[in-house]
Amino acid sequence: GIMISLVQMGVIALVYQVSGIGSFVLNELSLEPLFFILGLFPFWLLQGGTEEVATRGWLLTRIAARTNLPLAIAISSSLFGILHLGNSGVTFLSVLNIILDGVLAGLLLVYTDSIWLVVAQHGTWNYVQGNLLGFQVSGTGADASIFSFTMGSGPDWLTGGAFGAEGSII
């Protein structure tokens, strides 16, 4: 799960940097803020894990037991997207992307039979976005990050706008 998110966010960051959608600058950090940033990872696992246990570990499996797997993935993924509707900067594209990520998470759960892999993917995704790369995380800024991200100009569907990378077509 960790590797999946590292690759996903690494590709997104590379595309942003190379295409000029945005740029990254390494922050000058002393040991104290660096340890603080590294120490945030377990909290992202807890946050992402809570969402995954509720929408995939519980809801998806209950619906699949009563109906069928495609419907269970569709419903749990849609609920996952709906849970983000109140976030700052939310757009149709950002919710669609979150629903699609929910489908990926549902498939990962089904094919690996491991909620822990899905929790690791979700928590790492959020952590890398916010505390490593300096992106907004579903419309919320991180207090501290290894890199600072500066958004270039362009339409929100390309840059992600105020919602962050999850609101982009990339």
Annotate the PLM regions.
Residues 7-19, 46, 50, 79, ...:
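Alpha-helical membrane-inserting segments
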Residues 9-10, 40, 44, 68-85, ...:
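Small-polar-interrupted transmembrane alpha-helices in polytopic inner-membrane proteins
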Residues 1-53, 60-66:
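Juxtamembrane helix-loop-helix connectors linking adjacent transmembrane helices
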Residues 2-3, 34-38, 42-50, 70-75, 92-99, 155-170, ...:
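Hydrophobic alpha-helical transmembrane segments
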